[in-house]
Amino acid sequence: MSTETKNYITPAGWQALKDELYQLVNKERPEIVQIVNWAAGNGDRSENGDYLYGKRRMREIDRRIRFLTKRLEAAVVVDPELREATDQVFFGATVGLLRDDGREQTVKIVGIDEIDTAQNKISWISPLARCLIKAREGDEVVLNTPEGREEIEILSVEYIKID
């Protein structure tokens, strides 16, 4: 995602990123620094597994800290609970669907850092979300996939808290 693209995120998603950053900066990184310092004092670093693993893990943590910091700086927090009631689908909507095969499904349209298929959280830039956005309750939308075309009916649109 480029820096010009807005990073829409729900309050819960923003808090999850913030919590992960706190955990890395205040817990994991200090522990790894301590291990690396201890291992460095054990002599030859070229064959010192604790030292080599610790340095590699510290690089991974530092990379993740930079990533999370940038994502939080670019975040545009959108609270679905504060949205005016509407039957139109936008970011943060919880949408009830009727799929082509007759099964009902509920999806929550969230930020790209919040995707969780087990909880039916889909990114606002996913193909399904793109065909739903701006449609209204009762509308039928068409989702084109590599497997073919699927018609989906929008059964409900709600703006409720997304955990």
Curated annotation (Swiss-Prot):
InterPro entries: GreA/GreB_C_sf, TF_GreA/GreB_CS, Tscrpt_elong_fac_GreA/B, Tscrpt_elong_fac_GreA/B_C, Tscrpt_elong_fac_GreA/B_fam, Tscrpt_elong_fac_GreA/B_N, Tscrpt_elong_fac_GreA/B_N_sf, Tscrpt_elong_fac_GreB. The keyword Zinc does not apply. GO terms for biological process: DNA-templated transcription elongation; regulation of DNA-templated transcription elongation. It comes from the Bacteria. The keyword Transcription regulation applies. Keywords: Coiled coil, DNA-binding, Transcription, Transcription regulation. GO terms for molecular function: DNA binding; RNA polymerase binding. Residues 54-76 form a coiled coil. Pfam families: GreA_GreB (PF01272), GreA_GreB_N (PF03449). Necessary for efficient RNA polymerase transcription elongation past template-encoded arresting sites. The arresting sites in DNA have the property of trapping a certain fraction of elongating RNA polymerases that pass through, resulting in locked ternary complexes. Cleavage of the nascent transcript by cleavage factors such as GreA or GreB allows the resumption of elongation from the new 3'terminus. GreB releases sequences of up to 9 nucleotides in length. Belongs to the GreA/GreB family. GreB subfamily. HAMAP family: GreA_GreB, GreB. This is Transcription elongation factor GreB. It comes from Neisseria meningitidis serogroup B (strain ATCC BAA-335 / MC58).
